[in-house]
Amino acid sequence: LVALYNDSTGVNLNTSFISQDTLFPSYSVPADLHLFPATFYEDMDHDGIKDLIVSPNSSSESADKESIWFYKNFGGNNSPQFYLQNKNFLQENTIELGRESKPLIVDINNDQILDLLVSNFGEFDLSIPIHYNSYIESYENVGTNENPIFKKISSDFQNISSQINDINLVPTLG
């Protein structure tokens, strides 16, 4: 993310950029998203001061997890000072597997309580040739069928991703 600063003396049509921060905000943790970051200047914590949200603005080739970066503004609306608070704002208390997630409700441990399997198209990863790694996560229902409470059991149910090594896995039963 690049911040461009203009001089404060010119009229909008005649103003020029006088400095830039190519690792914005360089005084904190720079907002370094792989492709086409979108920024939002909104009061996210209801303290009356606008904060900064940075997230991917692309439907592909971008991170699926930790993809909503929340920077709290410790300055003011006219002189913001943004400091990273977390990289998974609004995602931290959810089951987040990224794009094209596919859930399947099934009793995986034969306790008569329905559990959860969730797959995805693939998690974005620049280090692998096709840039995506698909897997199935499993969640045991430690509550009841009427009031489910899901506890994550495995990030790769039955080690399927290493056996199949493909994208767009879909959990099914027959």
Task: Spell out what each predicted region is.
Residues 5-15, 74-80, 140-148:
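Short loop/turn segments immediately following beta-strands, especially the blade-tip
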Residues 12-24, 80-89, 148-158:
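Beta-propeller fold detector
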Residues 23-40, 91-104, 156-172:
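Repeat-based blade/solenoid architectures
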Residues 41-47, 105-111, 173-174:
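Acidic, divalent-cation-chelating loop motifs in proteins
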Residues 58-61, 122-126:
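Short glycine/acidic-enriched loop and turn motifs that connect beta-strands
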